[in-house]
């Protein structure tokens, strides 16, 4: 395809206004594991229960820390008292599991029948003496990963208030330690680390990452003498970070715009608008932005990024010059597209269910900068794309790879287009310097499979002549 068929500038379009994504209640899959003392109660129909059982793949005897409050005809027709039914379930949860927090997840059905979960939660919380957080993760209003966004936004309101005096006391302790350094005492161990890492306002990072990935990112910032005061969500509900006026917050995922808004408007935090730490280029830009806000000169980031790119050379040789088409599912599309363009790929289109241009402004700027740096045409960004139109565009463009939701994968494969499920990028470890290889492992898997089939001479049997797309 010639570059004339691809826009030369970053263009934004909006098509149908419909969401074609995985259900947002799937956020329970990773959040119940992240918040170790939590219990998630999904209030919905049997359909929601079937989805969770199939998507999460957890057997009932494993006693996972989530459950379904199944709505029946009596609930929907208002013959049963919603409050009493939820109270019965929560009392049973407290007796069996005794969690530190219960998270109610609202679904499409609770929205349609106007169930007042927010009104019932404070009353029940006072009765059973367990915090109850209400999050609306319904598929009518939200896309796949925005389920996590609604949960974190609700938890942001439960974070303790940051007190300026605590920081002042910390500064006094450091001053005392500095004074005592002139009068060394025997058998006294004074660590200089807190002094080095606290010459800036408190920093809270928000976004659910596996513990090892969060530790890696915290360590990368520590190397720049930046101390992370806390993560939202924390591993335990009782360890939620203190937020408030004077606290800086920064997101690690592009789908957390609601959480960012809550932290800024309701908790008066200052948001650091940065690209997201996906890929070595994004991670470097993310750290550099935080350093610039705190007036810190970054050290060794250029060498660190170059070292990572060098380790990816075998994958880069495979993807260079290949084309990719994002149909849109998990709101990670812009960050992944930017990274793949930096790897030498051509991105024809970035479909995305929802785009908050303010929250993703730095990421969009880095995307445009990357396209100019690599000399590739800038992709068109289509918000709420119409799948029929997308299939027609793919028929014309014939990309080497389509990153799509599971519903479209098999039909596209049957028509000769290699696919990769977008949901795999959601559950994979893709953040930070060290996990860039995992992204390329996922992207190149269908490409390597095709090469293997050709080498074996089986392509004629497995992949017949391409059928015209309908």
Curated annotation (Swiss-Prot):
Pfam families: Oxidored_nitro
Main location: plastid
Catalysed reactions listed for this entry: chlorophyllide a + oxidized 2[4Fe-4S]-[ferredoxin] + 2 ADP + 2 phosphate = protochlorophyllide a + reduced 2[4Fe-4S]-[ferredoxin] + 2 ATP + 2 H2O
Binding site for [4Fe-4S] cluster: 23, 48, 108
Localisation per UniProt entry: Plastid, Chloroplast
Required co-factors: [4Fe-4S] cluster
InterPro entries, per the entry: LIPOR_BchN/ChlN, Nase/OxRdtase_comp1, Protochl_reductN
EC code(s) of this entry: 1.3.7.7
UniProt keyword annotations, A-Z: 4Fe-4S, ATP-binding, Chlorophyll biosynthesis, Chloroplast, Iron, Iron-sulfur, Metal-binding, Nucleotide-binding, Oxidoreductase, Photosynthesis, Plastid
Gene Ontology MF terms in the entry: 4 iron, 4 sulfur cluster binding; ATP binding; metal ion binding; oxidoreductase activity, acting on iron-sulfur proteins as donors; oxidoreductase activity, acting on the CH-CH group of donors, iron-sulfur protein as acceptor
GO cellular component: chloroplast
Enzyme class label: oxidoreductase
Pathway membership, UniProt: Porphyrin-containing compound metabolism; chlorophyll biosynthesis (light-independent)
Gene Ontology biological-process annotations: light-independent chlorophyll biosynthetic process; photosynthesis, dark reaction
Record text on cofactor binding: Binds 1 [4Fe-4S] cluster per heterodimer. The cluster is bound at the heterodimer interface by residues from both subunits.
Family note: Belongs to the BchN/ChlN family.
Function: Component of the dark-operative protochlorophyllide reductase (DPOR) that uses Mg-ATP and reduced ferredoxin to reduce ring D of protochlorophyllide (Pchlide) to form chlorophyllide a (Chlide). This reaction is light-independent. The NB-protein (ChlN-ChlB) is the catalytic component of the complex.
NCBIfam families noted in UniProt: DPOR_bchN (TIGR01279), PRK02842.1 (NF002768)
Subunit structure: Protochlorophyllide reductase is composed of three subunits; ChlL, ChlN and ChlB. Forms a heterotetramer of two ChlB and two ChlN subunits.
Name of the protein: Light-independent protochlorophyllide reductase subunit N
Protein's organism: Zygnema circumcarinatum (Green alga)
Lineage: Eukaryota, Viridiplantae, Streptophyta, Zygnematophyceae, Zygnematophycidae
Name of the gene encoding the protein in the UniProt record: chlN
